[in-house]
């Protein structure tokens, strides 16, 4: 068999196998690759890796869970939607200037990511500055960052770009 015939057959066979096992499905304005019955957010995966490659997180601080800011965040969250929010535990806390981003876990509620602003009167939770629950089938990082950027446009873009989800429940 000639080489060009073998190469053509190999390409056609490969395309046939891909066509039989991989589909593209649209959902809420996004296209997902579907293989083995599971949706994969290829665009989100690329966006997440692009974000990790190009972001500069030198202005963002990682705060410890026993910092004074962490105590204020937990106190504010406990009062936000009692009684279930009273058992919040801080998974991750980041700060840029007077803005904070917290990832929280709860015993009874879905995990959440909140954006808060510190001021002279104390910590405040801006209106709609919360993501809660799973992002499936979307890639969690880009989906949560995009949501928070739309809901709290005054929050620093660098703070949002430097957030990477930790809690498995967000995936």
Spell out what each predicted region is.
Residues 31-39, 70, 74-82, 92-96, ...:
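Terminus-proximal functional modules
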Residues 55-88:
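Short, non-transmembrane alpha-helical segments in secretory-pathway proteins
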């Amino acid at each position: 068999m000639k080489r060009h015939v073998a190469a053509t057959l190999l390409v056609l066979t490969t395309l046939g196998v891909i066509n039989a096992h991989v589909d593209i499905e649209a959902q809420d304005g996004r296209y997902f690759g579907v293989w083995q019955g599971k949706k994969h957010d290829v665009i989100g995966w690329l966006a997440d890796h692009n974000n990790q490659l190009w972001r500069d997180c030198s202005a963002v601080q990682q705060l410890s869970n026993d910092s004074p800011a962490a105590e204020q965040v937990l106190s504010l969250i406990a009062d936000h939607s009692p009684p279930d929010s009273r058992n919040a535990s801080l998974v991750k806390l980041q700060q840029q200037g007077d803005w904070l981003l917290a990832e929280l876990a709860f015993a009874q509620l879905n995990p959440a990511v909140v954006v808060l602003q510190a001021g002279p009167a104390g910590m405040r939770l801006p209106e709609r500055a919360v993501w809660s629950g799973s992002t499936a089938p979307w890639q969690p990082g880009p989906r949560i960052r995009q949501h928070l950027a739309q809901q709290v446009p005054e929050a620093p873009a660098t703070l949002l770009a430097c957030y990477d989800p930790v809690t498995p429940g967000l995936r």
